[in-house]
């Protein structure tokens, strides 16, 4: 009998000067970037949290703490690949990932196809098992004021 689990992840980072904006493993031209210990890829962090949560392994901070210099500036695609490996070691497979980027600016639509391809590649799944979309908050809240960017992700994992 096939066992299935669902995971949910959420992440948010503040926008700051003098940082590159990396979302979904894609560098997006913008005057500010996300602050963080790693590359601050809010989308990949939310996906990592969803996958880790589905397996019952806590969250990204437990596995890749911001107090560990080894993760300073690290490409979050590396973190996602490591999470995927942890699933594989426990005989779990990714059924699908559905994620939403929450940002007033910049526009994400031109970059979503590349983000989706990176995520599918890093997880070792077909591209149709990954969905990435973006929305604004109609200028409401921290994202609407351009203070930061958030992302949410849900995943289904299966084994057996």
UniProtKB/Swiss-Prot annotation:
The protein's matches in CDD domains, at most eight in alphabetical order, are given as: MECDP_synthase
Which parts of the sequence are marked as the site Transition state stabilizer? 37, 136
Pathway(s) where this gene product acts: Isoprenoid biosynthesis; isopentenyl diphosphate biosynthesis via DXP pathway; isopentenyl diphosphate from 1-deoxy-D-xylulose 5-phosphate: step 4/6
Question: Which InterPro entries does its entry note?
Answer: MECDP_synthase, MECDP_synthase_CS, MECDP_synthase_sf
| Residues the record lists as binding 4-CDP-2-C-methyl-D-erythritol 2-phosphate | 11-13, 37-38, 59-61, 64-68, 103-109, 135-138, 142, 145
- Family matches, as Pfam families: YgbB
Q: Which GO terms describe its biological process?
A: isopentenyl diphosphate biosynthetic process, methylerythritol 4-phosphate pathway; terpenoid biosynthetic process
Q: How is the cofactor bound?
A: Binds 1 divalent metal cation per subunit.
Which Gene Ontology molecular-function terms are recorded? 2-C-methyl-D-erythritol 2,4-cyclodiphosphate synthase activity; metal ion binding
- Alphabetic keyword roster: Isoprene biosynthesis, Lyase, Metal-binding
What are the binding positions for a divalent metal cation in this chain?
11, 13, 45
Tell me its EC number(s), please. 4.6.1.12
Q: Which cysteines are joined by disulfide bonds?
A: none
Cofactor dependence: a divalent metal cation
Q: What class of enzyme is it?
A: lyase
- Record field: catalytic activity: 4-CDP-2-C-methyl-D-erythritol 2-phosphate = 2-C-methyl-D-erythritol 2,4-cyclic diphosphate + CMP
- Complexes and interactors: Homotrimer.
Q: Which PANTHER family match?
A: 2-C-METHYL-D-ERYTHRITOL 2,4-CYCLODIPHOSPHATE SYNTHASE, CHLOROPLASTIC (PTHR43181:SF1)
Q: State its role.
A: Involved in the biosynthesis of isopentenyl diphosphate (IPP) and dimethylallyl diphosphate (DMAPP), two major building blocks of isoprenoid compounds. Catalyzes the conversion of 4-diphosphocytidyl-2-C-methyl-D-erythritol 2-phosphate (CDP-ME2P) to 2-C-methyl-D-erythritol 2,4-cyclodiphosphate (ME-CPP) with a corresponding release of cytidine 5-monophosphate (CMP).
The Swiss-Prot or TrEMBL record describes its family as follows:
Belongs to the IspF family.
Q: What is this protein called?
A: 2-C-methyl-D-erythritol 2,4-cyclodiphosphate synthase
* Gene designation per UniProt: ispF
